[in-house]
């Protein structure tokens, strides 16, 4: 770690500096300056006026047009629908500019935005909708059929986007009156301690849990990428904020918290987001060239796909200046490959974050990342790191232990689940379940303690897939685990024990699973066999993983 980088961090966090922090009554750190709510954060973007903010396949918006549209929709929520602060607004859409209008309209109306995975099945969506009970659904035409039965039973309002027809009892966004460019937000009090978002993350019980972040937490999450960008600029001899505003390619789906980090960093400086509805490397190359994209960010799978496509087509990615990965651990070879082909022209970045931290809280970039490609970087100023052993006591520097985090951007808990909240937090510290080390203030993730599989940036919880397998009539027992995969990082594997007399093929089991869980969760390696367990009855996933790799290599 260079003295320049450490000096830059001190400059940015000194008393009176833009990212100075203080300790709150709960013991955690918070930013002294900056927004206290997402309403304060988004209202500042009015100053960017006619600069282009959102570019989609069918529509685009300047900052002025976006904010006016969000204000108009927020007033419809409060004045037309009678929604009140604290009511939930659920979004089930692929990436499009109107997704952002819906999200920020919810914030301006004091509602709690609940972004839902657009890839979920009917059963998965209905479970979560039953849990959070939204009063309004904001859906695209493709997903209306998935939620329509639920919203009829619940009596929830529905607004459809990019949809030809009109849902019975609902409204179509395209039919709303033209937006008055002078639209103002509704007169609603939004406080720092009010809930702002619920992002659902699956737990070891196999059921999704709603991670609830307050406005203060999300405002902190918005500061983290600003700090890391400023520190990176100073560390490389540049003044923060110099040059043109970024043009960023948004490959993360908006329902993932990884998208928040990319969104906040772009919005805070008046940059442009070029949206992708679904990932395709060749389409990405075309968008980068057409819109002169400067910043790429995505999960390692998409990053590798983009590099492959660029090499295959001879595209030199001439406009790119920044190349970031998140959502899953990037293979060290990725940054080595980027440097070998593009030198220092494109700055690499990566980091670490969770649903429970409202996005990225650690980051590393530039030469530090090139020299330490396995690192996850340093924490943002309002984030504290602790590495503990099995006794929950801190371990010596450099020794592995469980990573605990505390700070402004952490969630307040899980939606209506006190037991899960109590299990995940201790004295204000969130227990990540990840094994990590810290040296010189820099964190490296060693392994995962929790039984999860990171498949191409998607988090697959073994217990959730096992629960779906156990629901199948032919299955008596099941164990799910991850095995290495060259492109995806990991793929999902499962071993099942069939009920006596059951006559079913692995293909039939796969088809049955596809009706219960999202496609990325369905095991690609499925076999029948014994399931080894220890004396306590816990599955020996390491044994299963070795068996699967042996069969694949043999």
Protein language model regions, located:
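AMP-binding/adenylate-forming catalytic core of the ANL superfamily
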Residues: 120, 137-139, 296, 407, ...
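Gly/Ser/Thr-rich phosphate-binding loop
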Residues: 268, 293-297, 309-371, 384
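Structural core segment of the AMP-binding/adenylate-forming
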Residues: 1-14, 108-176, 500-502
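Conserved pre-ATP/AMP-binding loop-to-beta segment of ANL
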Residues: 180-200, 206-207, 237-247
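ANL superfamily adenylate-forming
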Residues: 20-21, 145-192, 207, 219, ...
């Amino acid at each position: 770690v260079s003295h320049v980088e450490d000096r830059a961090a001190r400059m940015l966090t000194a008393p009176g500096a833009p990212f100075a922090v203080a300790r709150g009554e709960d013991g955690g750190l918070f930013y002294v300056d900056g927004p206290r709510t997402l309403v304060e954060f988004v209202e500042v973007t009015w100053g960017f006026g006619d600069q282009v903010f959102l570019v989609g396949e069918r529509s685009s918006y300047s900052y002025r047009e976006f904010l006016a549209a969000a204000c108009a929709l927020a007033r419809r929520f409060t004045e037309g629908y009678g929604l009140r602060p604290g009511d939930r607004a659920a979004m089930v859409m692929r990436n499009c500019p109107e997704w952002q209008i819906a999200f920020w309209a919810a914030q301006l109306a004091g509602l709690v935005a609940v972004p839902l995975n657009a890839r979920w099945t009917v059963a998965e969506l209905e479970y979560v909708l039953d849990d959070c009970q939204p009063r309004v659904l904001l859906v695209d035409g493709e997903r209306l059929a998935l939620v329509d039965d639920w919203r009829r039973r619940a009596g929830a309002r529905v607004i459809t986007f990019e949809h030809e027809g009109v849902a019975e009892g609902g409204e179509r966004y395209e039919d709303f009156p033209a937006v008055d460019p002078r639209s103002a937000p509704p007169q609603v009090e939004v406080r720092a301690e009010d809930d702002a978002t619920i992002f659902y993350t699956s737990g070891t019980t196999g059921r999704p849990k709603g991670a609830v972040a307050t406005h203060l937490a999300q405002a902190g999450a918005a500061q983290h990428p600003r700090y890391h960008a400023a520190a990176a600029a100073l560390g490389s001899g540049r003044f923060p904020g110099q040059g043109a505003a970024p043009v960023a390619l948004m490959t993360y789906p908006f329902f993932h918290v990884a998208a928040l980090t990319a969104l906040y960093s772009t919005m805070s400086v008046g940059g442009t987001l070029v949206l992708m509805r679904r990932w395709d490397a060749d389409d990405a190359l075309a968008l980068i060239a057409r819109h002169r994209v400067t910043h790429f960010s995505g999960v390692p799978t998409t990053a590798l796909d983009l590099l492959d496509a660029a090499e295959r087509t001879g595209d030199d990615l001439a406009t790119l200046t920044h190349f970031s990965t998140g959502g899953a651990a990037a293979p060290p070879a990725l940054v080595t490959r980027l440097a070998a082909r593009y030198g220092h022209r494109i700055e690499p970045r990566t980091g670490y974050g969770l649903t429970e931290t409202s996005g990225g809280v650690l980051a590393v970039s530039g030469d530090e990342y090139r020299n330490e490609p396995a690192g996850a970087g340093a924490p943002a100023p309002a984030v504290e790191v602790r590495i503990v052993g099995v006794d929950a006591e801190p371990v010596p520097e450099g020794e592995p232990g469980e990573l605990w985090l505390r700070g402004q951007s952490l969630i307040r808990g899980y939606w209506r689940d006190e037991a899960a909240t109590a299990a995940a937090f201790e004295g204000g510290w969130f227990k990540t379940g990840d094994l990590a080390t810290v040296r010189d203030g820099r964190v490296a993730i060693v392994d995962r303690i929790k039984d999860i599989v990171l498949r191409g940036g998607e988090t697959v919880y073994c217990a959730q897939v096992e629960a779906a397998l156990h629901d199948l009539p032919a299955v008596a027992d099941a164990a799910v685990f991850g095995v290495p995969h060259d492109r995806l990082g990991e793929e999902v594997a499962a071993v099942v024990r069939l009920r006596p007399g059951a006559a079913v093929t692995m293909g039939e089991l796969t088809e049955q699973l596809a009706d219960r869980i999202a496609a990325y969760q369905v095991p690609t390696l499925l076999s029948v066999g014994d399931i080894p367990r220890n004396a306590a009855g816990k599955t020996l996933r390491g044994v299963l993983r070795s068996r699967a790799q042996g069969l694949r290599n043999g």
